[in-house]
Amino acid sequence: MAGGRHRRVVGTLHLLLLVAALPWASRGVSPSASAWPEEKNYHQPAILNSSALRQIAEGTSISEMWQNDLQPLLIERYPGSPGSYAARQHIMQRIQRLQADWVLEIDTFLSQTPYGYRSFSNIISTLNPTAKRHLVLACHYDSKYFSHWNNRVFVGATDSAVPCAMMLELARALDKKLLSLKTVSDSKPDLSLQLIFFDGEEAFLHWSPQDSLYGSRHLAAKMASTPHPPGARGTSQLHGMDLLVLLDLIGAPNPTFPNFFPNSARWFERLQAIEHELHELGLLKDHSLEGRYFQNYSYGGVIQDDHIPFLRRGVPVLHLIPSPFPEVWHTMDDNEENLDESTIDNLNKILQVFVLEYLHL
């Protein structure tokens, strides 16, 4: 997450105009598309019972995530750096070791930056790419470039090493359940899961339309021009995105997440219900309903983040970013020491339940 706070927020009027224009957005989801892209509009979750919730809570491991997924990412990893390559290899290796048969794609491209042309690489990991529809979880894996200060480097723990680790832990903890998505059956929706790790979310100098969101801008344009299913006419990979769930700035204590978009409000409400149910079952650590994460208020604007290129093309978005931002945002203190283990563990459980319910697993 990059740029000054005042540059990251679009006013309410701009947001209303943007949302109103979405159904007619160019190069994206068009009203003339065939019927299957509309299925996401009336898709319903398969609500899990208390026994299933306990099983999910027992199956996720914050200690395993911390050691195996998170700590290797707590390095300097701005685009083109040795740390960026190491982070990319780490993410790919963690996914490749799983049984669920993820299909990995690396979207590498060159883009002009304030420092000349730089190479960027998005990571796209898909279960059953032939499925027409996908629930998409996403985050960025790059860190913002800062000059070293007193031999310290910026590792972006909340921004966004923790979201990357949460997605990797979800894939590990739910591996056996996700195996069933390898094939489509008449008893299940033609629906699967996709994970996207964006490169180049951060600005190199100052946040602007040209210096930010390098990876998401490139990938959204690419997906908009790629027929889906392969060979289809009139539908693209963007039509296949049921919902883009974007994670950012997660890991600090006591976060509050507002609802940003009316067209995904019912999914935000599902997160609220899952949080409440897990709390009532005593499955959340150091958690109170007074300090719940998913709050009953809407945000009067839209924060500039990797969802924007997709939102402008009509993709429904659930933006999981706290407001206000963590106090350590864009400081050298955004590090492992200032992460809150209980919060991350609780959000892991909530997100994993959400995914299983959405996918009817």
UniProtKB/Swiss-Prot annotation:
Gene Ontology cellular component terms for the protein in this record: extracellular exosome; extracellular region; ficolin-1-rich granule lumen; specific granule lumen; tertiary granule lumen
Glycosylation sites noted in the Swiss-Prot or TrEMBL record: 49, 296
GO biological process: peptidyl-pyroglutamic acid biosynthetic process, using glutaminyl-peptide cyclotransferase; protein modification process
Record localization: Secreted
Transmembrane segments: none
Gene3D superfamilies noted in UniProt: Zn peptidases
Keyword Hydrolase: no
Keywords: Acyltransferase, Disulfide bond, Glycoprotein, Metal-binding, Secreted, Signal, Transferase, Zinc
Record-annotated disulphide pairs: 139-164
Active site feature: 201 (proton acceptor), 248 (proton acceptor)
Coiled-coil ranges per UniProt: none
DNA damage as UniProt keyword: no
Annotated binding of Zn(2+), by residue: 159, 202, 330
Documented effect of changing residue 207 to L: Greatly lowers activity
SUPFAM superfamilies: Zn-dependent exopeptidases
UniProt GO MF annotations: glutaminyl-peptide cyclotransferase activity; zinc ion binding
Main location: secreted
Mutagenesis or variant effect for residue 201 to L/Q: Abolishes activity
Domain of life: Eukaryota
InterPro entries linked: M28_QC, Peptidase_M28, QC/QCL
Listed EC numbers: 2.3.2.5
Signal peptide interval: 1-28
Catalytic activity reported: N-terminal L-glutaminyl-[peptide] = N-terminal 5-oxo-L-prolyl-[peptide] + NH4(+)
Stated family: Belongs to the glutaminyl-peptide cyclotransferase family.
Record's function text: Responsible for the biosynthesis of pyroglutamyl peptides. Has a bias against acidic and tryptophan residues adjacent to the N-terminal glutaminyl residue and a lack of importance of chain length after the second residue. Also catalyzes N-terminal pyroglutamate formation. May be involved in the N-terminal pyroglutamate formation of several amyloid-related plaque-forming peptides.
Protein name: Glutaminyl-peptide cyclotransferase
Gene: QPCT
